């Protein structure tokens, strides 16, 4: 996952919004020098120093008069670009090499090996997955596609239903901790950004793979490049029988879905414009996903479209973006049978418009931005009663309820640098039409100090808020009781850390403290008729503390006489949460967090063109659940071993892989067992046109 020869890599200067494979941070106007960090280091990439004003970046810089060799790549990671040596933000990067080495069939599988990320799956190959950061849940993380927020205000359960096949992903970037002034207020515990490939030539590529449990996946894509315009178009289909059956012997964890995605780019010296559109459609068995029924089913259909631009000349740089996301969901308590419980239909339309800018003056670099985002949901039962029902296409029913809310935010940030010291500080001011509140301001400040050419200390304070999802406000179904008077969650966080980075060794450690107020979750209550229900509430205050550590060894650098072992990486994270006024609450999400998480990855190259990866991850989850025998049960710790063997040629790649080699039985959610041993094999092909 790391480059084999670090000292031969040169730093590349990605001009802000140039036609390159960079990320969230380029879209947002942030800049940081990022090493190609392995996911298993579970650590963060930090900024190093290269002048942003240079037309090209050299692979060296001066530190107190000493020439220092760099082995990192320049991308963006602050509201306005600045000299990368002045940067203070931290980001974890899953590179294209990481994606190729990991035995994964979805973005969710990739994230399982990242420190501080909790991936809780309810079904195979990403059918339905909740992703949290540093003890947070699926509602408290922002997911972005090429820098555009694609979160679903209905529920975080469907957030990671993205229209991108794994083969079209260039990289994934992860920032942890609240940072409203960078990503907007929904990023309570952090943000994950998926960056897609852009066309660099005219080519045709395809893939096919198959495996256990009736798994089959195939896809095709085409890239074109002519002058300043490039286009990328792809589509894929995936299905599986699943790995369990209901009481009648029918499959109840099956999956079937398709994706299509298009991206275009126009890039000149004066202007860069990007646009994309995507579709995702899938249906999956939902055995015990949301309640005590082994025959549940869900279908989701999503569309995404956006246009982004940046001016490259003038004293003030402008970066506008406009987007529209539509999410449609049909939930069936009894599969294909709308009795005795009717199907639950929901449709959400999200419209967004933002404008960011930055300029230089004698005191540093200042960035200003504003965004307006409208969320409109119509539903068969969630929300307030509509004055005029809206027909549900393809059915004899109407949307009878709904909710519409608009969020307006303003951002200001300033960056300055003095010798080895760097600082970035600012705030976001936000107001939501749904919440009964005045405009609120959430500040943040990031500091860093370079101790030596290879090491740096950093510290940060950040804050943000999150509006309740529509599900938390209005979901009333079997065993669930909503609360439309929920208050927004608010989080403030402190973090300090240290990083050492040389050609052969990388080591990182981070300590953090989170203070969460008005925490929203579903807690178990007993009704007057002695029935258990899950009630959505604001309860108590959570104080959490944690540590993240990671070590990466480039074995080809440390032991140059051998060529079999490429690298070894190990990482560990620990989180402890304390809930004030906790009276033995059984929580649905928040209190079921990972106390311990560890992973290790060994990369090998047995012979030329053959790579072999062995990956192990350990998880120990806090919290309890009520099993099918009505007994309160604690989650048990578990370890999973995965492997992948790949043979690569310029025009094709062949692989075999296995997940859960030891066939462990484990749960991410109560009563929803995860698959045992799973074998897959496949091939991909690439033809230059």
Describe each region flagged by the PLM.
Residues 49-100, 108, 138, 312:
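Short, acidic, small-residue-rich periplasmic hinge/interaction motif at the N-terminus
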Residues 108, 112-148, 152, 170:
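Extracytoplasmic beta-strand/coil segments of soluble accessory domains associated
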Residues 149-176:
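Short acidic/polar hinge/loop motifs at secondary-structure boundaries
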Residues 166-203, 554, 559:
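A beta-strand signature from Gram-negative outer-membrane beta-barrel systems
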Residues 191, 196-224, 235, 250-254:
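Short strand-turn segments of transmembrane beta-barrel domains in outer membranes
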Residues 240-257, 271-350:
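Flexible loop and strand-edge segments within Gram-negative outer membrane beta-barrel domains
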Residues 291-313, 346-348, 436, 450, ...:
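Outer-membrane beta-barrel signature, preferentially recognizing the C-terminal barrel domain
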Residues 417-422, 513-515, 535-624, 684:
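Gram-negative outer-membrane beta-barrel transporters
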């Amino acid at each position: 996952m790391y480059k084999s020869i670090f000292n031969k890599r040169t730093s590349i200067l990605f001009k802000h919004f140039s036609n390159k494979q960079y990320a969230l941070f380029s879209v947002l106007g942030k800049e940081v020098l990022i090493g190609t960090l392995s996911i298993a280091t579970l650590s963060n990439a930090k900024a190093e120093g290269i002048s942003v004003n240079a037309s090209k970046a050299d692979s060296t810089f001066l530190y107190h008069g000493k020439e220092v060799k760099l082995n990192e790549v320049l991308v963006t990671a602050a509201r306005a670009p600045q000299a990368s040596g002045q940067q203070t933000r931290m980001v974890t990067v899953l590179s294209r090499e990481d994606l190729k080495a990991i035995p994964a069939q979805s973005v969710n599988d990739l994230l399982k090996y990242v420190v501080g990320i909790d991936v809780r799956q309810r079904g195979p190959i990403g059918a339905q997955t909740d992703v949290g950061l540093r003890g947070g849940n699926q509602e408290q993380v922002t997911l972005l596609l090429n820098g555009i927020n694609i979160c679903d205000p209905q529920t975080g359960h469907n957030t990671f239903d993205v229209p991108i096949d794994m083969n079209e992903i260039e990289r994934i970037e992860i920032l942890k901790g609240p940072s409203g002034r960078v990503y907007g207020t929904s990023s309570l515990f952090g943000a994950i950004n998926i960056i897609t490939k852009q066309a660099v030539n005219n080519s045709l590529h395809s893939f096919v793979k198959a495996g256990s449990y009736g798994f089959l996946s195939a896809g095709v894509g085409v890239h074109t490049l002519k002058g300043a315009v490039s286009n990328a178009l792809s589509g894929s289909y995936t299905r599986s029988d699943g790995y369990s059956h209901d009481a009648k012997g029918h499959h109840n964890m099956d999956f079937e879905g398709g994706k299509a995605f298009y991206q275009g780019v126009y890039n000149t010296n004066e202007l860069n414009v990007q646009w994309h559109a995507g579709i995702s459609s899938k249906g999956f068995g939902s055995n015990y996903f949301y309640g005590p029924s082994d025959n549940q089913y869900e279908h989701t259909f999503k569309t995404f479209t956006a246009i982004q631009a940046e001016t490259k000349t003038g004293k003030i740089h402008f970066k506008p973006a406009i987007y529209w996301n539509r999410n449609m969901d049909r939930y069936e308590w009894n599969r294909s049978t709308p009795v005795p419980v009717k199907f639950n239909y929901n449709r959400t339309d999200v419209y967004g418009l933002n404008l960011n800018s930055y300029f230089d003056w004698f005191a540093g670099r200042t960035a200003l931005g504003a965004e307006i985002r409208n969320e409109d949901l119509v539903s068969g039962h969630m929300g307030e009663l509509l004055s005029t029902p809206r027909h549900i296409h393809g059915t004899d029913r109407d949307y009878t309820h709904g909710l519409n809310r608009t969020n307006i935010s303003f951002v200001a940030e300033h960056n300055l640098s003095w010798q080895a010291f760097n600082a970035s500080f600012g705030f976001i001011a936000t107001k939501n039409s749904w919440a009964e509140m005045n405009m609120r301001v959430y500040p943040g400040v990031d500091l860093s100090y370079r101790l030596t050419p290879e090491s740096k200390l950093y510290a940060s304070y950040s804050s943000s808020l999150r509006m309740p999802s529509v599900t938390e406000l209005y979901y009333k179904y079997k065993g669930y009781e909503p609360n439309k008077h929920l208050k927004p969650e608010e989080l403030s966080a402190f973090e300090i850390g240290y990083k050492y980075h040389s050609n052969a060794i990388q080591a990182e450690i981070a300590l953090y403290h989170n203070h969460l107020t008005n925490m929203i979750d579903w807690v178990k209550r007993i009704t007057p008729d002695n029935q258990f229900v899950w009630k959505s509430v604001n309860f108590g205050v959570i104080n959490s503390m944690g540590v993240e550590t990671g070590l990466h060894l480039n074995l080809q650098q440390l032991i140059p006489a051998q060529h079999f072992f490429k690298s070894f990486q190990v990482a560990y994270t620990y989180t402890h949460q304390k809930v004030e006024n906790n009276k033995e609450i059984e929580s649905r999400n928040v209190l079921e967090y990972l106390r311990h998480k560890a992973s290790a990855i060994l990369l090998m190259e047995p012979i030329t063109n053959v790579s072999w990866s062995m990956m192990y991850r350990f998880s120990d989850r806090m919290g309890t659940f009520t099993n099918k025998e009505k007994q309160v049960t604690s989650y048990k710790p578990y370890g999973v071993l995965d492997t992948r063997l790949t043979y690569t040629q310029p025009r094709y790649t062949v692989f075999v892989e296995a997940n859960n080699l030891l066939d462990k039985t484990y749960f991410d959610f109560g009563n929803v067992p995860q698959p045992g041993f799973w074998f897959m094999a496949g091939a991909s092909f690439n033809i230059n046109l």
